[in-house]
Amino acid sequence: MANFSPLTVFISVTSLAVFQFLFHVGSSWLSTRLTGGFHKLSARQKIEWNSRTVSSFHALVVGCFCLYILVYDDAVNADPVWGDPFMVKLNVAVTSGYLISDLLLIIYYWKEIGDKYFVTHHLAALYACYYVLGEGMLPYFGNFRLIAEFSTPFVNQRWFFEVLGYSKYSLPNMVNGVLMTISFFIVRIAVIPIYYGRVFSTFGTEAFHRLGLGAQCAWIISSVSLDIMNVMWMIKIAKGCYKVLYHRDGKLTKTQNNGKLE
């Protein structure tokens, strides 16, 4: 039986309200002061711009909190399956509020930013949040997954540069592309052995059996599926980064041989 504490419900609702405010007010207010290009965007682009701004803010908040928990929350680190999930619940509650907020925006602005993949992703993520918030299960693993959010701001920044008219060979775009590739590898690929090392360490334990077959299957299947997608995305991102760097180098060599630089 799910047991959502009043505190986690309050944080989730507050999180939803804050992210709605940031989308409708905060993002536009800040963006107009950071770049004049925001005024030149179409209404459709402004909607996606605000959505991605909120996405980046959420990623930084929960990512930093995730790292803090991984380093300092002894209870969760000592018992990754049933350790005291209080700190993790706070972080996951913030994420739940964001996911619900983003789902509402996707549905309301379906013509502009509607995407069946993101709806499926958000619903699956909320299902995972249920196990942490409602059942107190798998706090370490639920929190560990949030470290992947650190790559999100770089992905969003690539889109910002694109709509602002930056060339893919421009220095800011190339630096961001390299940072995106590196961050994606570190927080989504390099951590895979660490994650599954902790997963395998729980097999056969009393804590693992207490989960029940349903939670066990949901946990393992979702983890493997997510990491398969991460590997596929990593390959695509790495190829794109290599292609841009290789062609940029080729262009510089060609222009230098012609006696001028573009």
Swiss-Prot record:
Keywords: Membrane, Transmembrane, Transmembrane helix
Ranges for domain TLC: 44-246
Gene Ontology biological process terms, A to Z: lipid homeostasis
Chief location category: membrane
GO cellular component: endoplasmic reticulum; membrane
Family: Belongs to the TLCD4 family.
Name of the protein in question: TLC domain-containing protein 4-B
